[in-house]
Amino acid sequence: MASVTLALAILSTLARTEAASSAEADEDAAYTRVITERADRIVGQLGIDDGEKATRVRDLIAGQYRALREIHDGRDAKLGHAKPPGDPAVARAWTNVVRDQANRQQFGLHRQFVARLSAELTPEQLDQVKDGMTYGVVPITYRRYLELLPDLTDAEKAAVLANLLEAREYAMDAGSSDEKHNWFRKYKGRINNYLSSAGYDMKQAEQNWAARQRP
């Protein structure tokens, strides 16, 4: 009787293990489809005539999404399950260490990714990939600043664009839409402070723009 009970327990454990493995495989397959389709949409905007090159670029982009998720998941697991108890200062230090480790991993991954894309694409196409990975926020936001402030000097336009491009580099590595947009919000704050110090009133600029739209 005991042997039968043991055998049933073993079979039950094996069944649960197989079910968990199957669910994990299904989840991974679904994620692979999502990132491949996302990468395909980006590559579709690049005008690449060489099918093999298009596939290589697609795989680079999809691979970057996967590698970033692994870094983010590892970081979040450490932050969520391994926080040291007790002194809040120790907890903050631990959080900073975990985030710094993840950021260093992301930095290396980012540089490698851009270098590999640069070997396949023109600078203009590389920009398109970066915009595709960040919802096209740079060109949209830059156009908006030019609409609001038509009297910007060339130097001021360059400063606005430089800040947006820097934000884009960080946003490319962010894991969620909110995290990506947070990077742009941070840098838009810097831009607005810069423009305010140069004498521009952003609230008045919004009002002036609205007035220009009225017939």
Residue ranges with predicted function:
Residues 2-13:
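Bacterial N-terminal signal peptides
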Residues 18-215:
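Charge-rich (acidic/polar
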